[in-house]
Every structure is written in C-alpha cells, then in structure tokens.
Amino acid sequence: MHFPGHSSKKEESAQAALTKLNSWFPTTKNPVIISAPMYLIANGTLAAEVSKAGGIGFVAGGSDFRPGSSHLTALSTELASARSRLGLTDRPLTPLPGIGVGLILTHTISVPYVTDTVLPILIEHSPQAVWLFANDPDFEASSEPGAKGTAKQIIEALHASGFVVFFQVGTVKDARKAAADGADVIVAQGIDAGGHQLATGSGIVSLVPEVRDMLDREFKEREVVVVAAGGVADGRGVVGALGLGAEGVVLGTRFTVAVEASTPEFRRKVILETNDGGLNTVKSHFHDQINCNTIWHNVYDGRAVRNASYDDHAAGVPFEENHKKFKEAASSGDNSRAVTWSGTAVGLIKDQRPAGDIVRELREEAKERIKKIQAFAA
C-alpha cells in the first residue's frame, strides 16, 4: 500500500508510471487487458476472473431495459455472481473492483428506461464502469439535447452515480461525439473485431492514433482515455495496440473460449477450428438478417465465421430459401448454419483456458515482446 511521504524510490517510480486507467481501477496491472461485454457470453464469473488477474472484466447487460425485462434479471444475477466469485458477498457495500457492465443502446423503445431500470441495479451491485455502445443515430438526431435515453443523458446519469463511462466507437466522428457527451474512455473498435460494430470503419492501425490525436487536440481540458478493440488475440497484438496510443486493450473472441464463458460447445469448436480470419470471417448485415435480429440500425453490422448460410447467400440463393434451410437446420440440431461471431484474429486462438490465465499470458507475452523491440531499437 502506498502512503504519501513514505514511499521508496522504486515505489515512487511505479506510482509515476500509473495511467489514468490504473487510477480509476487500482486493481489493474499494466498492460491493462479488458474483456468485452459480449452478449450471452460475458457473464459475472468470467468478468470476476479477469478482474482477479489484474484486468477489467465486463458483464453483458443486454439491450432490453423495459421494466420486467429478462435482460435486467440476468444482469442482476450475473453481478451477484461476480461479487460471489470475488469473495465479497458478505460486503455488499464494497464496489466490485475491475468489474464493468456493457449496455447496447440500439433498442430505441427501451433506452429511455435505462436510468429508471438499469441504474438502480448498478447502484445496488456497484460495478466500477459502464460500457455503452450502438446508440441509434436517428433517435439521437430527433431527440432534444440531453433528452431521456440519449447518450448524453445516460452518461450524465452514470457520472452522477460515480461510474466510469466507456463508449465504443468505430470512427473519429463518433469518438468526437462520445467525448463531447462526456465519455471517460473511448473504445476505438476496428473492423477486424468480431460481433457488432460500425458497418463503415477502419482497422485500429489508423483508427486508434487518429482518435488519440483528435482527443489531444480538441479535448485538452480533460484527459479522455483510448482503449483499442478489434483483431487482438495475443501479446503481440497488445503491444501493437499500445504502440498506436491505446492505454488498454480489449479482447472479445479470445475470451469466448475462456473456460468461464457462456459460449456453447459447438461455437467453441468453430472458433478453435477456424483459421485465416481474413478469409473465413465475414463482416455483413446478413448475419442479423438470417437471425431475424431487427433491433440494429443499419449503420451497424457484424463479423462472424463464414458458414453454410453465408455461402448460400454469396452464391445468390434467395433469402426465403436460405432462411428456411437455417430454421430447419436449427430445429434438427444441425449448427452448421448458426451464426458464430468472431474477429479476424480467430486463427491465433488455439486453446481453451481459464480467463485469468489468458490475462496473465497476454500480459507476459506483451512484456517479452516489448523487450525484444527494445533490443531491436538499441
């Protein structure tokens, strides 16, 4: 423990090296590894194990925030699970260290309820952060500034209750708006990411430094943190993201095969057997169309492993016929047409292991890679 005025030179050096993320999340270790709030995958146990290993673990909070929604019940259950896993069940007033919640804002019918239904759950369970993503641009444009359910109103309400706010973006334009709305952390997600994302964007190699430069230039009055997401699966990718200007690194696909994740076995198998992600994953609106998922605005699409349904689509099979095959396969237990969200780094993922081990391995790999780079530059 650090006491002002009683620190050694070594301790003073360590303190000087702390980043803004470290100050907000004192249990984190550098480089900061963050597990993404993947819907139906990122549960409380997974988040807790990431936190215990010195990372930041996010629990998926869903997208339906209307009173009585099953998403609300599941969120409360998973946060209680995280508290239990962290050994804090008998300390209900202690904040959950290194734990956050992810909320999808594209369901315009339910976003006005966030502060009425989600916020009380967050206050009760005390995660440290909230990650927002996919606000509907039409809803934002048609609403009065700060109206209920807008990003700005939600961020202000979260700040008033003491939460650090992450906001996921895919363009510099959206990063600017998120920062103007008050976000503390910009999650700069590149198009190599798995799952939902901006339909039009770039990879983190250009996105992260341009977002960082914009924030330094236009938001000088406060420090807005940037973390990178998309296409990272090992320590080499972590170092690359840090070199681009990120203060922390988000991984999604790597954690889908963590032992603690809620990923079904057939999807784990798909992830572990897929390689050459640039060829064998596809970024498209088709994945939501075949799933009949209608809540997503068309500015968002998603990246998933190429499968029989997509191959038929690419070959020109009419959607009605393709969807019939999709439903018949699902009803017969054939998962070859099911959507498995995945990023392009899927080919780097070779095994299933505990989430804490993944975090520690990423951190050590990154440190070793940094040493090698320093040797090259000497």
Swiss-Prot record:
Any one GO biological process: response to xenobiotic stimulus
Stored Pfam families: NMO (PF03060)
Cofactors that this protein relies on: FMN
Reactions listed under catalytic activity: ethylnitronate + O2 = chemical entity + acetaldehyde + nitrite + H(+)
Propeptide: 1-15
Entry annotation: catalytic residues: H196 (proton acceptor)
Cofactor binding comment, as recorded: Binds 1 FMN per subunit.
Residue numbers binding substrate: H196
Record EC number: 1.13.12.16
GO MF annotation, one: nitronate monooxygenase activity
Source species, domain of life: Eukaryota
Alphabetized UniProt keyword annotations: Flavoprotein, FMN, Monooxygenase, Oxidoreductase
Residues annotated as binding FMN: P37, M38, Y39, A229, G230, G231, G252, T253
Function: Catalyzes the oxidation of alkyl nitronates to produce the corresponding carbonyl compounds and nitrites. Anionic forms of nitroalkanes are much better substrates than are neutral forms.
Subunit architecture: Homodimer.
Family, per entry: Belongs to the nitronate monooxygenase family. NMO class II subfamily.
Protein name, as recorded: Nitronate monooxygenase
Originating species: Neurospora crassa (strain ATCC 24698 / 74-OR23-1A / CBS 708.71 / DSM 1257 / FGSC 987)
Gene: ncd-2
